[in-house]
């Protein structure tokens, strides 16, 4: 028998709270407004977000798009009940992929899915997304919040991000003049960033620690909070260095797969990256993970950034100029390696020296 009249079912009875969704929208409006930039000044709530390329100052742009997630780092945020920074990670994973192609991030959209919507939790997450957008200089022009009872366990959620940027035609990276002898610069990471967290969680499980335990690799932080250090956003320093020096030939975002998977993606087939591992200043978190989990250096290098979240390829004569431009914007820069000749079928990344873990 169907339900009808005053005893009929409602959407809320099925586990979807429209009022909670509306409350979330009101809570996040100030955060969203704070991300406005030339080209985007609309309000959220429409069927689609708008962006005016001409108002953003482009004349002959090529659009560049990227999407990504945060992975199982979210599980730590959920278990530690700390949701303020995973939105920064979400933005970082997308916009860092745009800037490596020479593109300026313009706008961002998010997808937030949960089994039971908590407006305060959702506002914390979106607040982090807005913070990441401000840091990257892109507008949060829309998104989707999906309350899906039965799809997620209580308290669980997932995030996906979508970013679009632009570069003037002819200004895209990598350039076509990468050459043997060019120097590879490494930009320091802020921590584990957003890759390898399934292994991180397994190591923490083996350690016997919980998320509220003091972090064994840093002072004055709980383990969960320390591991949730947000992914560094390299956009503004890199864009400034690209424009001021004109000397950056290629960039690579060091994410899942580490050096061996990410650096070759931006290199011509006849060149390989020779990385001097002795130059890498490995942050304590990676040393702790390696020792606690008994993880070999080779596995660390293909799972984590190990302290280098971005690399840049420049000609030898431009190392000082590019390094100075990046350091002036707060980046820590090392000379990580150089470009060498690569035989057909050979690896795109080779190592010398020893990783200090």
From Swiss-Prot:
This is Phosphoribosylformylglycinamidine cyclo-ligase. HAMAP family: AIRS. GO terms for biological process: 'de novo' IMP biosynthetic process; adenine biosynthetic process. It comes from Rhizobium johnstonii (strain DSM 114642 / LMG 32736 / 3841) (Rhizobium leguminosarum bv. viciae). GO terms for cellular component: cytosol. The gene is purM. It is found in: Cytoplasm. GO terms for molecular function: ATP binding; phosphoribosylamine-glycine ligase activity; phosphoribosylformylglycinamidine cyclo-ligase activity. Its EC number is 6.3.3.1. It catalyses: 2-formamido-N(1)-(5-O-phospho-beta-D-ribosyl)acetamidine + ATP = 5-amino-1-(5-phospho-beta-D-ribosyl)imidazole + ADP + phosphate + H(+).
